[in-house]
């Protein structure tokens, strides 16, 4: 249900029945709401977030109870919330607190038709020193192309592929899949599955974007800023091209630090999508270009 406060804010309310078990951790995930929101569980404020377009997670393990739980999301407008989910994970799990991303960073490097390098890094914390992370790279039909296990203390894996199939828009929207497993005492306790694509991006002096050396017509480039990550999933599979306009993120930020945080969240949450060809900043925020290059060096 939705109620309205005297100062014009909207309160989205829900009763969440739960069979709480002590061996699990519980996170609330919100795909997006108004420019700012506050989250209450059983009338206790547990977090707040600025940014309509970025996913937000908060640990609610200590606040929820066995039985009915009251969830209130207070927004500064009546814009409907996108999906809210309760994520249940074991005590040992990939990070759900790393800027709202998947807990896994996939950065293609040195891409050509003959070879490709992909830097893959999982994010985890509070794990035993002997914990391991296993990485497996597959085709979408399940053929294994590479695999390796690394210690959690050195989680980066540089994967090399020969003769890769490039993601080439609607001509060939070829995707790969990386599966990361968290291994503790010989058992896989958590797993992440993330699709990704391989393509070369560059930009000409006139502003035209090239994908694998071919110019993308302006009419084929969708200018967007999405809250729901499933939109980009569909574009990856369909072979559509997106130019992500970041102006609205900059406009809703309270200050420079808030703007940096919003941009970091959005880029890290969506950088693995091959359909996103470029990030576009407004001219009055061009000083954040260095931040975008630091977060994502693969796009022009």
Model-derived regions: residue spans:
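Active-site clefts of carbohydrate-active enzymes
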Residues: 249-254
């Amino acid at each position: 249900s939705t109620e309205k406060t005297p100062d014009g804010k909207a309160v989205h309310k829900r009763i969440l029945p739960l069979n709480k078990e002590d061996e699990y951790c519980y996170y609330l995930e919100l795909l997006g709401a108004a420019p700012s929101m506050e989250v209450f569980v059983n009338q206790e404020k547990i977090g707040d977030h600025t940014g309509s377009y970025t996913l937000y997670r908060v640990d609610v393990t200590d606040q929820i109870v066995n039985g009915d739980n009251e969830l209130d999301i207070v927004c500064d407008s009546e814009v409907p919330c996108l999906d809210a989910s309760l994520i249940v994970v074991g005590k040992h799990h990939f990070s759900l607190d790393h800027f709202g991303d998947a807990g896994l960073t996939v950065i293609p490097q040195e891409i050509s038709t003959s070879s490709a390098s992909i830097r893959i890094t999982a994010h985890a914390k509070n794990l035993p020193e002997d914990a391991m992370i296993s990485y497996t790279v597959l085709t979408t039909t399940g053929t294994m192309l590479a695999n390796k296990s690394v210690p959690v203390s050195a989680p980066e894996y540089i994967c090399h592929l020969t003769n890769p199939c490039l993601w080439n828009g609607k001509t060939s929207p070829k995707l790969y899949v990386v599966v990361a497993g968290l291994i503790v005492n010989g058992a896989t306790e958590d797993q992440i599955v993330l699709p990704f694509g391989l393509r070369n991006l560059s930009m000409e002096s006139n502003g035209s974007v090239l994908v694998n050396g071919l110019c993308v017509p302006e009419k084929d480039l969708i200018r967007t800023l999405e809250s729901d990550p499933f939109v980009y999933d569909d574009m990856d599979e369909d072979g559509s091209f997106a130019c992500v306009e970041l102006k609205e993120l900059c406009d809703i930020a309270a200050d420079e630090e808030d703007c940096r945080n919003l941009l970091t969240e959005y880029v890290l949450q969506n950088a693995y999508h091959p359909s996103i060809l470029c990030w576009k900043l407004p001219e009055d925020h061009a000083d954040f270009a260095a931040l975008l290059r630091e977060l994502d060096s693969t796009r022009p």
